[in-house]
């Protein structure tokens, strides 16, 4: 008879320490140069612990990003789409400058690492997109926008696109004031909200 191997569960405090080590290392050396050995050393843990909890580096980094994300889309529900989007703009704007070196490293790595892209898609992007879709469904249910509004399909792209594009096009962060103006000038009119 063989003994069942139990996967030990890390405390939330210990998990947060590991995630912080991951974020710091990606900021310092980039995703490609970050190793599980370096994470183990920085977090004073063993590689075995890391691999027991996460399949590998892509999953660990995606989990760290999910844990440390500054904007919690799920928490945004003011009772109106305009209110939701302005609240989201403020939160995203406050966080935009916070992690540019980290996000730059991840953005570069995603383009050449399909495992990282898949882990981020599963653990971060899909859940956040579902929350944005729920925001639109609430607005449809309240009668704020038509269910068949053509721009509904592109809602997530409009909301997230401004954050990414402003840095590349203007060299500036998309702060809350900029994003609020963008919401009023682009997103709401595209959805048919006056």
What is the predicted function of each stretch?
Residues 1-29, 33-44, 48, 59:
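Basic, helix-initiating cap at the start of DNA-binding domains
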Residues 72-102:
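Hydrophobic alpha-helical connector segments
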Residues 97, 105, 115-142:
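Amphipathic alpha-helical packing segments from all-alpha helical-bundle domains
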Residues 18, 33, 56-61, 71-72, ...:
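Short amphipathic alpha-helical segment with a characteristic S/N-K-E followed by hydrophobic residues
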Residues 56, 112-114:
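Short loop-to-helix capping motifs
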Residues 1-5, 87, 94, 130, ...:
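C-terminal peripheral helix-coil segments that are non-catalytic and often amphipathic
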Residues 118, 122, 126, 140-185:
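Hydrophobic/aromatic-rich alpha-helical bundle segments in the mid-to-C-terminal region
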